[in-house]
Swiss-Prot record:
The gene is miaA. Monomer. Its EC number is 2.5.1.75. This is tRNA dimethylallyltransferase. It comes from Geobacillus thermodenitrificans (strain NG80-2). The keyword ATP-binding applies. Residues 35-38 are annotated as: Interaction with substrate tRNA. Belongs to the IPP transferase family.
């Protein structure tokens, strides 16, 4: 029997975490994090990782499973997430994937076969050398020239994914975005795909306010601890919220400039997330602009899920 799952996606600061917990309590669910950065230990504030006292008794999976410089890929996420879906379902619970890393979520729930992916190790080495000599931005410009769609959704600092996209283009002559669409065959599960959105001005205000809260909660100290451990050449510390403060610690920018850059990068990331989910997945969208209507929205989304998956509350 095909497992039933709920997937909640959307931009940063739209309210995915809070909604996921509310729905998990109503539906007897367990949450699988669909965030590529929340897997890392010691990166809590900058990734907006849910705190233990905020989980309200709902089990959460794929948090704090790797050290910051331990390698982790979409292939490993796919394997772990699918195993969790099987395990949670077998225990009579409902798997709920919550996150904003589109490729990871897509790889977990679709018939995505990475063994089919073309590769060229020598070309990868050459691109890594180029990034080391000319910087991540130069590599990203190359991707923009051949595959603007992928360039729009892959952050310039995510060198590993930029290289992967260029490698696929090099090997196939097709943009990575086009190759990915060919890989996305069908959903593996009976899925309710929920997308959360909000008015842009409201979302951007929330993002700016959240950055200020992160600073107050100790983000500078969190990033400083990674910096002082000498963690530099790994993907985790290139994440938004970490890279900007590394620039501050390196003396490249003032603290105020780093914080403003963090806000700007977060807003841009939210825009890219929305664009990606609208173009890549058949999502049912719900507007979360008004926080006063949260309880109403929970009921509305619950009814949609119950109808889509033929569920009852507290399964």
């Amino acid at each position: 029997m095909t497992e039933k799952i709920v997937v909640i996606v959307g931009p940063t600061e739209v309210g995915k975490t809070k909604l996921g917990i509310a729905l998990a309590k109503k539906l007897g669910g367990e949450i699988i994090s669909g965030d590529s950065m929340q897997i890392y230990k010691g990166m809590d504030i900058g990734t907006a990782k849910v705190k233990p006292d905020e989980m309200e008794g709902v089990p959460h999976h794929l948090l704090d499973i790797k050290e910051p410089c331990e390698p982790f890929s979409v292939v490993e996420f796919q394997r772990l997430a699918r195993a969790l879906i099987t395990d949670i379902s077998a225990r009579g619970r409902l798997p709920i994937i919550v996150g904003g890393t589109g490729l990871y979520i897509q790889a977990a729930i679709y018939d995505y076969r990475f063994s089919d992916a073309p590769s060229d190790e020598a070309y990868r080495r050459a691109l890594r050398q180029l990034a080391a000599e000319q910087g991540a931005e130069a590599l990203h410009e190359q991707l923009k020239a051949v595959d603007p769609e992928s360039a729009a959704r892959i952050h310039p600092n995510n060198v590993r994914r930029v290289i992967r996209a260029l490698e696929v283009y090099h090997c196939t002559g097709k943009p990575f975005s086009e190759w990915q669409r060919g890989q996305q065959r069908q959903l593996l599960y009976e899925t309710a795909l929920i997308g959360l959105t909000a008015e842009r001005s409201v979302l951007y205000r929330r993002i700016n306010e959240r950055v200020d809260e992160m600073i107050a909660e100790g983000l500078i100290e969190e990033v400083r601890s990674l910096y002082d451990r000498g963690l530099r050449d790994c993907q985790a510390v290139q994440a938004i919220g970490y890279k900007e403060l590394y620039d501050y610690f390196d003396g490249r920018v003032s603290l105020d400039e780093a914080i403003e850059q963090l806000k700007q990068n977060s807003r841009r990331y939210a825009k890219r997330q929305l664009t990606w989910f609208r173009n890549q997945m058949p999502v049912e969208w719900f507007d979360m602009t008004d926080p006063e209507k949260f309880a109403v929205k929970v009921e509305e989304i619950f009814r949609y899920i119950a109808g889509k998956l033929r569920l009852e509350a507290n399964i």
